[in-house]
Amino acid sequence: MNKKVILMILDGWGKSPDPKVSAIDNANVPFINSLYQNYPSAQLRTDGLNVGLPEGQMGNSEVGHMNLGAGRIVYQDLAKINLAVAHNTLAKEQVLVDAFTYAKENNKKVHFLGLVSDGGVHSHTSHLRGLIDATQEYGLDKVYVHAFTDGRDVDPKSGANYIQDLENHIANTPVKIASIIGRYYAMDRDKRWERIKLAYDLIVNGLGTPSRDAVASIKESYENNITDEFIAPVIMVDEHGKPLATIEEDDVVIFFNFRTDRGRELTEALSQQDFHEENMHKLNLYYVTLTNYDETYQNVKVVYNKDNITETLGEVLEKANKTQIRIAETEKYPHVTFFFSGGREIPFVGETRILRNSPKVATYDLQPEMSAFELKDALVPELNKGEVDFVCLNFANGDMVGHTGIMSAAILACEAVDACVKEVIEAALANDYTTIVIADHGNCETMINPDGSPNTAHTTNPVPIILVDKDIKTIHDGVLGDIAPTILELMGIEQPAAMTRHSLL
């Protein structure tokens, strides 16, 4: 075969066992429904060991795109660090040994920053517990946790329980919770520095609502209809109303999120550069991150560096002198570029990148179509030229609007995607492209939990694969790592040995 191929990723578009709770099943999506009638389809697994995560762990976009581009199962930081905690080797990692030794010898505070939940997308509470236990092995008594509440990868009001669990864990130690803030502020990734400033001012300047009871403060937020993701800054104080701890020059800071994208902005403000407009100034810190947030950072120590993934789909296409387009809106742009290329920032020879900005709204239920129509309008003319050999396209709506937990908005998101998919596939068929329609993980097919509360998290449901091609009549079930070999077979390019999964044709 010698086909031109489009990989169309409908982000967060899973297959629900219960249509009642599914935005997809409740939406009017006639075109995507017609694809199931007219073309071969099957299912892909995007969770747990199928994508290199711990068993039962829901997939996510970073992991999904990494597996898609790699053509193999890529073992993720979560699985790797879980093993280190379980086997008690975390405390023996040299970077942590050095940091704790420095703190001990210089009588400095150790601050842990990160997302306190077991969602396993950005962080895991077991890692924080392992790190805290390690500080106690070293006899450190000035240890503080700056907790970011989640409510997005886990239930919106689960934060009080996670903080209570953390308090139980540190009860008989000198370790203390120093501050609390929602991830919406501390973990922005859209250069909304006014959000990051709230987190910076909290942990550096002690600016927040003073509290002596962390769990009570979170529950108070719930009473005011503020869920975990959006909890306003809370600073923990002593009996004199003074902050228990703020981050000061020469302190040790350990950011324990293992996923890189939402740790970058706060790290930049704390350790890399001054933001004069926001009145944020970098401090001279002993700064440690669990994984490598950015190659260009100065004076940041990394506990677990990524193994380089070579011979990804992008690299194989470059070697075969094929052209490729990577196209997405801001929210998923790193996924179709950096993650799909196995952690590589630089475009391949013959690779064109098309970015459309995600709308600047507070939450995407306010604009559920996001920038899908702009993406479609940018891609269709490229397909009509018929020149590009491969396209990787991501529609973010099912995931990003699914995260709001608002069914009516997610339905509108699905309908917008359907309209855009129709135009792209019509152009694809007219210009002899084969389109593989898949998702990277589930989300908007389960908008309601069994207890009736909104579900804002990803799912472990299987996702569809539809092969839109005039000739091919069958496609098999598989995992995300099978997609790159499938694409190479369609394009008539030999699969490299490093791609250990297989084609689904």
Put a short name on every predicted segment.
Residues 1-505:
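Feature captures the catalytic ectodomains and active-site-proximal regions of enzymes
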